[in-house]
Curated annotation (Swiss-Prot):
Belongs to the ketol-acid reductoisomerase family. One of its GO terms (biological process) is L-valine biosynthetic process. SUPFAM superfamilies: 6-phosphogluconate dehydrogenase C-terminal domain-like, NAD(P)-binding Rossmann-fold domains. The gene is ilvC. Its cofactor is Mg(2+). The keyword Oxidoreductase applies. This is Ketol-acid reductoisomerase (NADP(+)). Involved in the biosynthesis of branched-chain amino acids (BCAA). Catalyzes an alkyl-migration followed by a ketol-acid reduction of (S)-2-acetolactate (S2AL) to yield (R)-2,3-dihydroxy-isovalerate. In the isomerase reaction, S2AL is rearranged via a Mg-dependent methyl migration to produce 3-hydroxy-3-methyl-2-ketobutyrate (HMKB). In the reductase reaction, this 2-ketoacid undergoes a metal-dependent reduction by NADPH to yield (R)-2,3-dihydroxy-isovalerate. PANTHER family: KETOL-ACID REDUCTOISOMERASE, MITOCHONDRIAL. It comes from the Bacteria. It comes from Halothermothrix orenii (strain H 168 / OCM 544 / DSM 9562). Disulfide bonds: none annotated. Mg(2+) 1 binds at D191, E195.
Length: 330
């Protein structure tokens, strides 16, 4: 049964005497740090020497320290740096300076779940993961609202890890919308699956395939772009607002009939079987192992495939058409 927690379930007072170090000042880092500070908590920012975010964090009113120094000063350490560098930074700048009773916080479980970070037994480990990009986490907080979040406890040395996690979630505004209890395993595996099979890998491959089929059949690339990529936002926005039902109530009956009859032919049982294979690769750690090795080898496959897609016809056509729609960036 799902457990959801709200403001009334969280005690911000548990953090009032704590020093919180937010490591990283990117999308989530800047939002979480500012929300915590505006909630009246003691927050410092930890960054690598020479970070381009150093001056930005200072201009936002934070005391900024090198990562290792921030860890030394903190009771609660939120690790908001990219997955692929977390393990190295942990070994060099976090682990040597951890003290008994500290709490390590994450917003994604990759490195804990796949054993790339193995903290000592005498610290708390929990996750608070807002389910929105950082700019929205910040904007909703400023509007007196919040975005939903996830909470997971991996290690409860203090006996209060869950309570500390809920307090942290309240500090960044998530308990206003609701915080769902999960595990590091569930968050990590479902997050990776969603990215690979649906949100990123699935969608980009579907869009490219549709575009290519139309162009190969002799249709103008610009028309193919509008039909297969540009209008995608309109449909996704409707689904975001009210699920499949609102989307289908908002499109023509012709479009809905095509949706119902043709959709299952495209995403058929073979596709679901492939999705199951992808999920098994995630669950077994095979994907994590490949990604870790790819980074150690300086990303040859990652860079080659990224470059290939950046030079795809759909990108060239898209740039030209987006230049005709200046309101997109308003």
């Amino acid at each position: 049964m799902i457990h959801v927690y709200y403001d009334k379930d969280a005690n911000l007072g548990l953090l009032e005497e704590k020093m919180i170090a937010v490591l990283g000042y990117g999308s989530q880092g800047h939002a979480q740090a500012q929300n915590l500070k505006d909630s009246g908590l003691n927050v410092i920012v930890g960054l690598r020497k020479g970070s381009s975010s150093w001056k930005k964090a200072e201009s936002d009113g934070f005391r900024v320290f090198k990562t290792s120094e921030a860890v030394k000063r903190a009771d609660i350490i939120q690790v908001l740096i990219p997955d692929e560098v977390q393990s190295r930074v942990y070994k060099e700048d976090i682990e040597p300076y951890l003290e008994e009773g500290n709490a390590l916080v994450f917003s994604h479980g990759f490195n804990i779940h796949f054993g790339q970070i193995v903290p000592p037994d005498n610290v708390d480990i929990f996750m608070v993961a807002p389910k929105s990009p950082g700019h929205l986490v910040r904007r909703m907080y400023l509007e007196g609202k919040g975005v939903p979040g996830l909470l997971a406890v991996e290690q409860d040395y203090s006996g209060k890890a869950k309570e500390l996690g809920l307090a942290y979630a309240k500090g960044i505004g998530c308990t206003k919308a609701g915080v769902i209890e999960t595990t590091f395993k569930e968050e990590t595996e479902t997050d990776l699956f969603g990215e690979q099979a649906v949100l990123c890998g699935g969608v980009t491959s579907l869009v490219k395939a549709g575009f290519e089929v139309l162009v190969e059949a002799g249709y103008q690339p610009e028309i193919a772009y509008f039909e297969c990529l540009n209008e995608l936002k309109l449909i996704v926005d409707l689904m975001f607002e009210g699920g499949l039902t609102k989307m289908r109530h908002s499109i023509s009956d012709t479009a809905q009939y095509g949706d119902l009859m043709v959709g299952p032919r495209i995403v058929n049982d073979n596709v679901k079987d492939e999705m199951r294979s992808v999920l098994k690769e995630i669950q077994s750690g095979e994907f994590a192992k490949k990604w870790i090795l790819e980074n150690k080898a300086n990303r040859p496959v990652f860079n080659a495939l990224t470059s290939k897609d950046e030079n795809h016809l759909i990108e060239k056509v898209g740039k030209k058409l987006r230049d005709m729609m200046p309101w997109i960036n308003e």
